Amino acid sequence: FTFVAIMGLTNASNAFMENVYFEVGTSAVGVEADGNHNDAQSQVTTGAVGKTAVTGSYGLGYMLGSGTLGLDLGYMVTPGEAKIRSTSDSASGKDVSLEISDMTEMYVAPMLNMTDDASLYLKYGWNSTDLTTVGDVNKINSMDGNTVAIGTVMSWGSNLYIRTEVGMTEYDKLTFTGLGNTNGVPTTEKVTATPDVHYGRISIGYKF
């Protein structure tokens, strides 16, 4: 139904091709992290946690091509931050916190022009997220991953367009190990996690 409604707004002739663009969007996001915890007694616990959120983003890019095929090259920023806090199982109960902020993505998306005003695309992206680790564990400064997605771009007038997209980002495995400092987290404690993000996004863009 969304597809049909958006198609009704289009009235330009392949106007989104061969243009630099700027866009802003909002996403419904679901985050899942599978991992395990190896405590000071060498007991291993496995599990998964999940959370949902609504985020905003903005980006710049360039669409090029003509006829049936095209290509979209872009860079997107998702500002904001989130903090995770954990308490060690050691006798000290030392707190460890992890702050995630400012996700960026570079992407390439081959496009198939279905009509004069609408394109379908497949996207592959390279993601990086800043991390700030506080506590007696090894410090990891970034979290990297890759995105695969499918979406549509619908021309709306002569300069505007609407983008809809669904996809997932799989991040590299994170491993945190205690440093064993005084009143800190023992070196025998270790946590690993592999975060995955699933999302749906709608954006409005302007073509220069």
Descriptions of predicted regions:
Residues F1-N14:
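Gram-negative bacterial Sec-dependent N-terminal signal peptides
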Residues A12-F208:
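Gram-negative outer-membrane beta-barrel domains
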